[in-house]
Amino acid sequence: MGQKIHPHGLRLGITSEWRSRWYADKQYADYLAEDIKIRDFLSEGLDRAGIANVVIERTHDRVRVDIHTARPGIVIGRRGSEADRIRGQLEKLTGKQVQLNILEVKNIDANAQLVAQSIAEQLTNRVAFRRAMRKAIQGAMRQPQVKGIKVVCSGRLGGAEMGRTERYHEGRVPLHTLRAEIDYGTYEAHTTFGRIGVKVWIYKGDVVGGRRESLMNARDERPSRGRRERPRRGGARRQRAEQKQEG
């Protein structure tokens, strides 16, 4: 089941959190339909902004929308004009007061949704699919919190007559382990040969006792501002001579 089910849905309440945070009794269906419309509007209107996640919170008369994006300048616009336009459209869509928060995603290579979108954009620009997949894998594995990544592309790859699926992975991606923090993202590339689907799984370590291994690794592996020590050069003869002098 771990190979087929959505990694976020399988781990809700364990390693992943809900992306819609509100409670409703009789209005549940209306609120859910509104959430779907909000997400569709943002994904279609801000496809160039690199949206990684949209979190929606509701109160009785207010809707709070948190947009996690790699390019906040596109979402905000000049002097906040684009953000005001988006807020107005969302208020017209929901009929309620909307609080819009725009949050920047700093580590792009460790976010599965942004990695999938990057691969899809390269495929749209006629970059070879193998090169795009390998470049994404190399960029992700350089991050200290990433322990494994799997990338899948499906469609008429390279303009072939028959569609097929290509898979590349590096490191560990334990989809059956519930305590594993798995980030998952999908995107579609619209090419001249048709649509190509891109799926990305990124493993960032385990979550034990509420502590995320990915956060601990990111803190430990921060580069120091001081000068790095160069490795000493020399063969076995020099090492033996130094050992004799010490002895």
UniProtKB/Swiss-Prot annotation:
Highest taxon of source: Bacteria
Keyword annotations of the record: Ribonucleoprotein, Ribosomal protein, RNA-binding, rRNA-binding
Keyword Transmembrane part of the UniProt annotation: no
Record field: compositional bias (Basic residues): 227-238
SUPFAM superfamilies, per the entry: Prokaryotic type KH domain (KH-domain type II), Ribosomal protein S3 C-terminal domain
Keyword Ribosomal protein: yes
Domain KH type-2: 38-106
Residue ranges, annotated region (Disordered): 214-247
Gene Ontology terms describing biological process: translation
GO molecular function (one): rRNA binding
CDD domains noted in UniProt: KH-II_30S_S3
Gene Ontology CC annotations of this record: cytosolic small ribosomal subunit
Regions of compositional bias (Basic and acidic residues) in chain numbering: 214-226
Coiled coil: none
Function as written in the Swiss-Prot or TrEMBL entry: Binds the lower part of the 30S subunit head. Binds mRNA in the 70S ribosome, positioning it for translation.
Record's subunit section: Part of the 30S ribosomal subunit. Forms a tight complex with proteins S10 and S14.
HAMAP family in the cross-refs: Ribosomal_uS3_B (MF_01309_B)
Family as reported in the entry's similarity comment: Belongs to the universal ribosomal protein uS3 family.
Protein's name according to its UniProt entry: Small ribosomal subunit protein uS3
Lineage: Bacteria, Bacillati, Actinomycetota, Actinomycetes, Mycobacteriales
